[in-house]
């Protein structure tokens, strides 16, 4: 695999871009106009996927927030049947909304399964 390349003008990461006129692969900065010809024509794509709960910072006070709706959803950690919930966007390729539950007894955050 190749190393990341950085812009010599603003130090942001360079991204692959096709130069259709010269028919070469270039590495271009998304922040300024800098670009350079890529040393190789190989492009690697890395996709990282994680759950919404891992990406969401849950306030410890969420379970005591009177404005959040409540549910009798069972907590997978303590098996109590009371949780507050709210919606968040998925960070994956789709734009579906996901329900995040926070147990009012132990504060554990979990997604609807």
Curated annotation (Swiss-Prot):
Entry's Gene Ontology cellular component terms: cytosol; nucleolus; nucleus; RNA polymerase II, core complex; RNA polymerase II, holoenzyme
Xref: InterPro entries: DNA-dir_RNA_pol-M_15_CS, Rpa12/Rpb9/Rpc10/TFS, Zn_ribbon_RPB9, Zn_ribbon_RPB9_C, Znf_TFIIS
UniProt zinc finger (C4-type) residues: 7-32
Molecular function terms from GO: DNA-directed RNA polymerase activity; nucleic acid binding; zinc ion binding
Cellular localization per UniProt: Nucleus, Nucleolus
Region described as Disordered: spans on this chain: 54-74
Alphabetical GO biological process terms: maintenance of transcriptional fidelity during transcription elongation by RNA polymerase II; transcription initiation at RNA polymerase II promoter; transcription-coupled nucleotide-excision repair
UniProt binding sites for Zn(2+) 2: 75, 78, 103, 106
Top-rank lineage group of the source organism: Eukaryota
Alphabetic keyword roster: DNA-directed RNA polymerase, Metal-binding, Nucleus, Transcription, Zinc, Zinc-finger
Zinc-finger is among the record's keywords: yes
Residues annotated as binding Zn(2+) 1: 7, 10, 29, 32
Compositional bias ranges of the Polar residues kind: 54-66
Main location: nucleus
Zn finger limits (TFIIS-type): 71-111
Pfam family, one: Zn_ribbon_RPB9
Record flagged with keyword Transcription: yes
Family: Belongs to the archaeal RpoM/eukaryotic RPA12/RPB9/RPC11 RNA polymerase family.
Function statement: DNA-dependent RNA polymerase catalyzes the transcription of DNA into RNA using the four ribonucleoside triphosphates as substrates. Component of RNA polymerase II which synthesizes mRNA precursors and many functional non-coding RNAs. Pol II is the central component of the basal RNA polymerase II transcription machinery. It is composed of mobile elements that move relative to each other. RPB9 is part of the upper jaw surrounding the central large cleft and thought to grab the incoming DNA template. Involved in the regulation of transcription elongation.
Subunit structure: Component of the RNA polymerase II (Pol II) complex consisting of 12 subunits.
Name of this chain's protein: DNA-directed RNA polymerase II subunit RPB9
Classification of source organism: Eukaryota, Fungi, Dikarya, Ascomycota, Taphrinomycotina
Gene that encodes it: rpb9
């Amino acid at each position: 695999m190749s190393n990341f390349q950085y812009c010599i003008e603003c130090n942001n990461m360079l991204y692959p871009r096709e130069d259709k006129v010269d028919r070469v692969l270039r590495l271009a900065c998304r922040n300024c106009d800098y670009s350079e010809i890529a040393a190789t024509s190989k492009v690697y794509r890395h996709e990282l996927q994680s759950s919404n709960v891992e990406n969401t910072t849950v306030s410890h006070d969420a379970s005591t927030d009177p404005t959040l709706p409540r549910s009798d959803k069972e907590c997978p950690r303590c098996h109590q049947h009371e949780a507050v919930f709210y919606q968040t966007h998925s960070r994956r390729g789709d734009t579906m909304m996901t329900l995040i539950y926070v147990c009012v007894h132990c504060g554990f955050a979990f997604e609807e399964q």
